[in-house]
Amino acid sequence: TTDLPTQIQIATDLICKFLRMVPTIQEVYIWKGTDYHEIYGLPAGEYIATKVQEKMKISTKYMGNYSWIELQYKDHSKKLFISHHASGGTVYPESAIARDLQGFLKAWGAERLPIKPDIIVRAHNHSFIGIHEHNIRAIQLPCWQFFVPYDNAMKRYPYWQPDIGGVITLFDHKLRTTAWPFTYPNIIDPQSYLKLTKIYGVTGKRLGKK
């Protein structure tokens, strides 16, 4: 659906369902999504965070456009850069992720970034991709929304079919990382799928009904 209140309700219900399945979760973080999911002055993510916290009584924080997060365990540390927004690569989407990774390395080497990320997490392109280079793991998240037939999406119809699901990232006692994606089968929109049953055939030189 492209109806914003329905999208907010669905996202809230999905997060709450996951929290009930994993009751040990102590905090939830939500980042800003694409602008067409937003209302001016009231980001959808901020509203979702408020609803989740009210419903589940668990600390839920709206993080805005991006965040740097540092994980620490004993003598080990991992730094994550997280943002919904991502550069595109329609035909070869892996190349966009690789360029992003190289851009972080270049900016860090030129001292334009004070931190070298260990993990880069992005979304927006609606498909799961995982790349590991130069001791950096780059993860592009799948989507929770089925195909939306707006003009640009229809032009790139075979390329913009989304992966529906999520990613669970596991860290061991040394903060070594494993990204475990889970996806669900896509579906055909029943309103756009027309099944024609053959009722006519050619008999001799005449078109006759079979």
Pin down the residues of each PLM region.
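Generic beta-strand structural signal
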Residues: 24-28, 65-67, 78-79
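Core catalytic region of metal-dependent phosphoesterases/phosphodiesterases
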Residues: 1-61
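A short catalytic or substrate-binding loop motif that flags glycine-/basic-rich loops and adjacent residues
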Residues: 60-64, 160-163
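Conserved beta-sheet core of the metallophosphoesterase superfamily
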Residues: 77-81, 86-180
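Short, electropositive alpha-helical surface patch
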Residues: 37-55, 136-144, 199-205
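Active-site glycine-rich loop that binds ribose-phosphate moieties when present
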Residues: 51, 55-56, 63-67, 96-109
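A short C-terminal boundary segment appended to hydrolase-like catalytic domains
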Residues: 171-210
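Short acidic-hydrophobic surface loop/beta-edge motif
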Residues: 66-75, 132-133
